[in-house]
UniProtKB/Swiss-Prot annotation:
It is an enzyme of class 3 (hydrolase). Removes the formyl group from the N-terminal Met of newly synthesized proteins. Requires at least a dipeptide for an efficient rate of reaction. N-terminal L-methionine is a prerequisite for activity but the enzyme has broad specificity at other positions. GO terms for molecular function: metal ion binding; peptide deformylase activity. One of its GO terms (biological process) is co-translational protein modification. Its EC number is 3.5.1.88. Fe cation binds at C101, H149, H153. InterPro entries: Peptide_deformylase, Peptide_deformylase_sf. The active site is at E150. This is Peptide deformylase 2.
Length: 209
């Protein structure tokens, strides 16, 4: 199992609307989920991935637990596994966010996303192989964007198609560090604050004072 990128031979799966997963889960689906859970734990530096990103056109995503349960104090390598997830905006407020993607290595983009969303899904419990229906609201920057990004994958969409601005990852982080060292921005600045700022600097040439 490996991540499918936009340069992979089987990249077509990234642009296909994923199939709804049968509930209750079949034995085959549970075996696939277990294989993906093990794969998820094998690499670092991820917020999560949607199943089409590993070559399967099914509506399942795996994400870091602390992004699903924002009250968690510590991180774990066990993913939260969501089946047939969907989201909807619960306010009209949008902000520019900076995003990257395992399927588009070496790039980051500025994308407009809703700030406040409601997530609905079946939560899979790997220890018991049971499902429970969940509905949660998210108002934090990273989590609210995550659901939009990952569920886009289930709709055959990749963030670069929505990006207002696309940059090389190395150039972005180098530029960000220059801005920090010059005192133009703060190192802990939220992405919803950094996104529009980077856009203004690169596109409009407006350097913050």
């Amino acid at each position: 199992m490996k991540i499918v990128t936009t340069d992979s031979e089987n990249k077509a799966v990234l642009y296909k609307v994923a199939s709804e997963v049968e509930i209750p889960l079949t034995k085959t689906t549970k075996e696939k989920i277990e294989a993906m859970r093990i794969f998820y734990k094998s690499f670092q530096g991820k917020a999560g991935f949607a199943v089409p990103q590993v070559g399967l056109s099914e509506r399942i995503i795996l994400v870091e637990q602390h992004l699903f349960d924002t009250t968690m104090a510590e991180e774990t390598d066990e993913p939260t596994i969501l089946v047939n997830p969907s989201w909807r905006p619960i306010s009209d407020k949008k902000e520019w966010d900076i995003e990257g993607c395992l399927s588009v290595p070496g790039k980051v983009g500025v994308v407009e996303r809703y700030v406040h969303v409601e997530l609905t899904a079946w939560l899979y419990h790997s220890d018991t192989e049971a499902l429970s229906k969940i509905k949660r609201e998210y108002h934090r920057e990273y989590s609210s964007v995550l659901w939009q990004h990952e569920i886009d994958h289930l709709e055959g969409k990749i963030y670069v198609d929505k990006a207002k601005l696309l940059l090389n990852e190395k150039d972005f982080y180098s530029f960000r560090q220059q801005l920090i060292e010059s005192g133009k921005i703060q190192s802990g600045m939220a992405l919803f604050d950094l996104g529009p700022l980077i856009y203004d600097i690169v596109v409009k040439g407006e350097i913050p004072s």
